[in-house]
C-alpha cells in the first residue's frame, strides 16, 4: 500500500529566499560603504575590513566579488555614473553631433560641470583623483575604466569635425581634446578657480580658434 505524502507544513510551504535579490542588496550596501569611506577617511585608510563592517557583510563576501579595494571603488563609482545616466533618460550617452562643433562640446562640458558639482560625485571622485596622482597603478585604472570611454567620444566627435572641414586635418584629436578638459580638471581638482558654464564655454571658444582651418 502506498504511503501518503505528508501535507506540507506552513514552514516548508514558504518560498525559498531570493539569493539574487539578497546578493544585489549586499552589493549595493558595499558600493555605498566604499564611496562613503573614501570620502570620510581617504583612499589610503579605506580598507576591505572597513567596507565590510560599514556594509554589514563579511570580508569573504567582498573578496568573492572583487580582488582589491580599488576594484570595489571603481565598480561603485561606475555604478554611480550609470545611475546618473538612468536618471537623465532612456537614451544611452553619446556625444551630440548637430553639425555645430562649438555647441556640441559646450553642451557636453556643461553636463560635466553639473556632475562635478553634484555632491554624490564630487567627494568620491575628488578622493579617487587625488590618490591617482600619487598612486600610478590606481591612476592608470582611473584613466582606463573611468575616463577613456569619455575621451573616445571626444575623439570621435573631433574626427567628425575634421571630416566636415571644421577642424584642421593635421590636428591630433587625442591632444586637441585636452584643450577642453584638462584646464577644467585642473581648476576643479586644485581649486584654482570656480567652475561654471561661462568658464567651459570660454574654453571651447578659445580652443576652437586654434583648431579651426586657417
PLM-predicted stretches and their roles:
Residues 1-17, 103, 107-108, 148, ...:
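C-terminal peripheral helix-coil segments that are non-catalytic and often amphipathic
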Residues 1-41, 45-56, 65-74:
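Basic, helix-initiating cap at the start of DNA-binding domains
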Residues 89-122:
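Hydrophobic alpha-helical connector segments
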Residues 31, 38, 47-48, 58-59, ...:
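Amphipathic alpha-helical segments enriched in hydrophobic/aromatic and basic residues
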Residues 103, 114-123, 127, 136-163:
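Amphipathic alpha-helical packing segments from all-alpha helical-bundle domains
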Residues 65-66, 142, 185-186:
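Tryptophan-centric aromatic hotspots in well-structured domains and transmembrane helices
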Amino acid at each position: 500500500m502506498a504511503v501518503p505524502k505528508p501535507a506540507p507544513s506552513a514552514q516548508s510551504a514558504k518560498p525559498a529566499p531570493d539569493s539574487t535579490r539578497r546578493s544585489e542588496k549586499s552589493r549595493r550596501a558595499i558600493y555605498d560603504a566604499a564611496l562613503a569611506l573614501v570620502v570620510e577617511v581617504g583612499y589610503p585608510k579605506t580598507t576591505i575590513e572597513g567596507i565590510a563592517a560599514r556594509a554589514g557583510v563579511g570580508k569573504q563576501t567582498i573578496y568573492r566579488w572583487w580582488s582589491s579595494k580599488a576594484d570595489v571603488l571603481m565598480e561603485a563609482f561606475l555604478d554611480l555614473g550609470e545611475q546618473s545616466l538612468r536618471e537623465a533618460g532612456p537614451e544611452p550617452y553619446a556625444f551630440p553631433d548637430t553639425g555645430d562643433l562649438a555647441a556640441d562640446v559646450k553642451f557636453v562640458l556643461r553636463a560635466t560641470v553639473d556632475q562635478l558639482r553634484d555632491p554624490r560625485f564630487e567627494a568620491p571622485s575628488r578622493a579617487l583623483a587625488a590618490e591617482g596622482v600619487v598612486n600610478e597603478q590606481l591612476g592608470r585604472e582611473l584613466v582606463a575604466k573611468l575616463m577613456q570611454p569619455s575621451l573616445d567620444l571626444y575623439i570621435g566627435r573631433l574626427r567628425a569635425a575634421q571630416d566636415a572641414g571644421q577642424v584642421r586635418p593635421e590636428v591630433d584629436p587625442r591632444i586637441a581634446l585636452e584643450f577642453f578638459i584638462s584646464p577644467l580638471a585642473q581648476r576643479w581638482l586644485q581649486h584654482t578657480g570656480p567652475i561654471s558654464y561661462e568658464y567651459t564655454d570660454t574654453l571651447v571658444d578659445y580652443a576652437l580658434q586654434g583648431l579651426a582651418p586657417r
